Design a protein with these regions (language model features):
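Beta-rich accessory regions
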Residues: 7-8, 12, 34-35, 109-112, ...
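Beta-sandwich/jelly-roll carbohydrate-recognition scaffolds of carbohydrate-active enzymes
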Residues: 2-208, 241, 498
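Active-site core of glycosidic bond-cleaving carbohydrate-active enzymes
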Residues: 203-228, 266, 270, 280-532, ...
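Aromatic/His-enriched, Gly/Pro-containing loop or helix-boundary segments
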Residues: 201-208, 249-267
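Carboxylate/His-rich catalytic cores and anion/metal-binding grooves
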Residues: 161-188, 226-239, 261-295, 360
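A conserved hydrophobic secondary-structure block that centers on an alpha-helix together
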Residues: 6-10, 20, 161, 206-210, ...
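Secretory-pathway/luminal and periplasmic proteins that interact with or process carbohydrate-rich
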Residues: 20-23, 180-186, 244-250, 301-302, ...
């Protein structure tokens, strides 16, 4: 902080306000004055994580001369005997649910007061250890330079050239986004608060939290398996620790700061684990991983899963968003089957391969869409293919979710009438009109994030444009992918067509701009699209380089005329993971028709 006048300066510490700032967010806050340059404390909140305690330590570069604070809470159940002290001024402890504190300094003109903040999930001692270990000095420029170097080391893992500067900005903004979560969740000594609320030590791995798995299994974690496999393996180990500490003995659904918040559906940890395993990123306990996946997928209490196990579908009259749940469970079950097959567990492979076919049970051939079923086995009569809320779906409608069988696209195509009929159906998704009433009450979605009835801001659609490839219409994949890249991403404050969802929207952009995408994580295949870059160079952790080159690249030349891999013509529109991590060169020959 720089103060422009020769006067008394004030720094306010606000422990009562937050991002959403709703009442009763704070359970308790506490502040302790250690000396005239060091304060410690914690803030315990409920909400997204219903029991979250952040411990902190703050040091000032200049001593404060006095301080004070106030608890603005209207009610306090029990005040104790603290009332005998004047706690508003120069009292070394402050506590309450609505606490603000101030610190006064004597400054001269243009004086700077620097602050360093350390946080911990374990203790104020841990916060102070983190602070002193990570920034032991007061050299601001050094911190800035070191921070820039760290970011550059991440950003340069993929180096690209583009036609337009804004495409370059979009790409590296996307890489930046993919580095923001999951987040490191342990102190420098390895300690962290676990899901059981006890203190654990991360030995030989970095512990992570903030797992928005319903979103990030699709592209973020597959991206990590290419450019950050060690980090992704540590994330999987963190998920396995979550499983062991969980009262329910489940892998994370949407976990944050030693809490499971149960947001969204599916059990997509299994997708992240299977994708890593199938791609050779196995620096974790594979036997524990398979155990955790199987046990999670057998939890009958979870989101209609008992009905799904018994009936082969989730009944809408027993558990809402039933079609979405059925389809996502089927995909997750396929992921478990792939792991079991690789580990020679034939019994588990057969069980979950059979379960992975359950998507068929909610397809109504009479209307050509996935449709909610009731517990008596009949389809629900009230049915609107465009409706989302209370209609059997979550963050999507029947149009979107009827295309969600990522693990068996050819079977889906045959079920929906064959390749020509499917291609026509899929094309109409992008050309039809979705009336405003169908998304008026949907958070984070506006007309700007929609192309026809394709809603890019909702993740269930992220693989959809690539399905044209499986219907022998790769040109339609190429046309639509390039259109989405250009329309749904802008270098501005409103530049995304929806919530970035912990890096998933950005990971989609990175893959698609490079020219390929993981339609079914848990497979070793990527589906080819239409690259946006002129060239790209992926620096792989194994020391090799995978290069991408486009010939005749332009705004109009969105169609792929030919592809070569290491000088040989690529047959079809599938790229293998081994092709990438072995290093080499992928060349796209582009054209306007």
């Amino acid at each position: 902080y720089t103060f422009s006048k020769n006067e008394e300066a004030h720094i306010i510490l606000d422990l009562m306000s937050g991002i959403y700032n709703y009442e009763q967010k704070n359970v308790w806050t506490y502040l302790r004055i250690e000396n005239d340059t060091l304060i410690t404390g914690y803030r315990q909140t409920n909400g997204w994580a219903r029991n979250r305690t952040v411990y902190f330590a703050i040091t000032f570069s200049k001593p404060f001369k006095n301080y004070g604070g106030k608890n603005f809470a209207k009610k306090q159940v029990y005040k104790g005997f603290w009332g005998k002290f004047d706690q508003s001024k120069n009292f070394p402890e402050m506590a309450g649910t609505q606490l603000r504190a101030y610190f006064n300094f004597d400054v001269n003109t243009n004086d700077k007061i620097k602050m360093k903040v350390g946080i911990s999930s374990v203790s104020t001692e841990g916060a102070l250890l983190n602070l002193r270990s990570e920034i032991p000095h007061w050299d601001f420029e050094k911190v800035k330079t070191e921070g820039q170097a760290l970011w550059n080391s991440e950003l340069q893992k993929i180096q690209i050239q583009t036609l337009h500067k804004e495409d370059l900005t979009n790409f590296y903004t996307s890489i930046y986004h993919t580095c923001l979560s999951p987040t490191v969740y342990n102190d420098v000594d390895g300690k962290y608060k676990g899901l059981d609320q006890n203190v654990h030590v991360a030995s030989n791995f970095t512990n992570y939290t903030t797992f928005s798995l319903w979103d990030t299994y699709r592209a973020l974690h597959p991206l990590f398996n290419i450019i950050q496999p060690k980090r992704n393996a540590d994330m999987i180990t963190s998920m396995l620790m979550h499983y062991q500490q969980s009262a329910e003995k489940m892998l994370p659904i949407w976990s944050h700061y030693a809490n499971e918040n149960w947001c969204m559906i599916g059990y997509h940890s299994v997708s992240v684990i299977a994708d890593a395993m199938m791609k050779g990123n196995t620096n974790f306990d594979a036997n524990l991983a398979l155990e955790a996946c199987v046990n999670t997928a057998r939890k009958r209490f979870y989101e209609g899963l008992g009905y799904y196990i018994d009936k082969g579908f989730v009944p809408e009259d027993k558990s809402g968003s039933s079609v979405s749940k059925t389809l996502e469970y089927a995909y997750d079950d396929w992921c478990i089957a792939q792991m079991a097959k690789q580990m020679n567990r034939e019994d588990i492979y057969k069980e979950f391969t059979a379960r992975s076919e359950n998507y068929r049970n909610v397809y109504d051939a009479s209307v050509g869409f996935m449709r909610p079923k009731l517990s008596d086995g009949t389809f629900k009569k009230e049915f609107d293919v465009l409706s989302t809320h209370q209609a059997g779906y979550i963050e999507g409608n029947s149009w979107n979710y009827s295309l969600y069988v990522p693990h068996q696209p050819l079977s889906l195509i045959n079920m929906m009438g064959g390749k020509k009929a499917f291609a026509r159906h899929l094309d109409s998704l992008f050309t039809m009109e979705l009336p405003d009433k169908y998304f008026a009450e949907t958070e984070d979605i506006s007309r700007d994030g929609i192309i026809g009835n394709y809603v890019h801001g909702n993740e269930p659609s992220h693989h959809v444009a690539y399905l044209f490839n499986y219907a022998d219409e790769p040109r339609m994949t190429q046309k639509n992918i390039r259109n989405i890249l250009n329309k749904m991403y802008k270098p501005s404050s409103d530049g995304l067509g929806g919530n970035d969802d912990c890096g998933q929207m950005s990971a989609w952009y990175i893959f698609s701009a490079l020219g390929f995408y993981p339609v079914a994580p848990g497979s070793t295949e990527y589906s080819i699209g239409s690259p946006l870059v002129k060239s790209a160079s992926i620096q792989l952790p194994n020391g090799k380089t995978f290069r991408i080159e486009t010939k005749n690249q332009s705004d109009k030349n969105v169609y792929v005329k030919k592809i070569t891999l290491n000088g040989k013509v690529l047959d079809g529109y599938i790229l293998k993971h081994e092709d990438i991590v072995s290093g080499g060169e992928l060349v796209f020959f582009m054209g306007s028709e």
